[in-house]
Amino acid sequence: MDYKHFKGVHANIVIEVISLLEKGVKKAQEILEKPDAGSYTKLENSSGDTPIKADLALDKFLEENFLSLENVKSVFSEEKEKPVTKENGSYLIAYDPLDGSSVMEANFLVGTIIGIYEKDYKAHNLAASLYVVFGHKIELVVALDQVYRYAFYQNKFHFIETIALENKGKIVASGGNQKDFSMGLKKALEGFFTENYRLRYSGSMVADVHHVLIKKGGVFSYPQKKLRKLFEVFPLALIIEKAKGEAFYFDKGVKKRLLDQGVESYHEKSECYLTSQHEAQILEKYLKGE
């Protein structure tokens, strides 16, 4: 892989993580392709979810590889109660080994989300983030100073494009239980569909956000506090912001930046809106004051 796009103080750790992923893609793919990969285990993770076999196998594989990096002090999986910590290193990695596992048996797109933090697991210390999506193609998206997209081909990640969202999109990925949506959110969504936006929600957050990114705009929304800050929300929020979009939530009817949120506990959850600029304005108009 050509690393010419990665510059700045955090470039080296990003390159090291990508290098590990590039070498490990085939192993990860083998794990996902096993006939029983989507079978549920009899275990329960720290968030109260029942992981599938591929979740645990990918988690073990990634943890071992991330801990092998000299400059990584701590590694924290969504599947674990607390981080695994070493004596040395400057960076902390939080990751969701298999986002979208609940729809894997339907052969939908799934992926691995990774946040690279510095000093501690706080949003303001998020140095970079990336994800890998597994489908008929394997792709990598990385946020450092900008957002870069790669495709895996012949054992290497090849650069496709620098992603920048346009002001307005045409995709809506609205997750959660619609009966619990506020009246403002229902009106905002109705307005998008009146403007011929297309519904593209799969149940895999990484897949739906990837769709918004490659279509250069739109809305991903999850108004219930179900998504984990450290492993899903913060890393994808950084990617959206670096792609010139907005990442926000509403606190008593006031729109606030996701990456300004604090973290009171490791597995704390949040609502989440990831959008291009126009859609952010529309959502604020309808949800303000609710």
Curated annotation (Swiss-Prot):
One of its GO terms (biological process) is gluconeogenesis. Its EC number is 3.1.3.11. Pathway: Carbohydrate biosynthesis; gluconeogenesis. Mg(2+) 2 binds at residues 96, 99, 232. The keyword Phosphoprotein does not apply. The keyword Protease does not apply. Substrate binds at residues 99-102, 201, 226. Mg(2+) 1 binds at residues 78, 96, 98. Its cofactor is Mg(2+). Keywords: Carbohydrate metabolism, Cytoplasm, Hydrolase, Magnesium, Metal-binding. Binds 2 magnesium ions per subunit. It catalyses: beta-D-fructose 1,6-bisphosphate + H2O = beta-D-fructose 6-phosphate + phosphate. It is an enzyme of class 3 (hydrolase). One of its GO terms (molecular function) is magnesium ion binding. HAMAP family: FBPase_class1. Homotetramer. This is Fructose-1,6-bisphosphatase class 1. It comes from Helicobacter acinonychis (strain Sheeba).
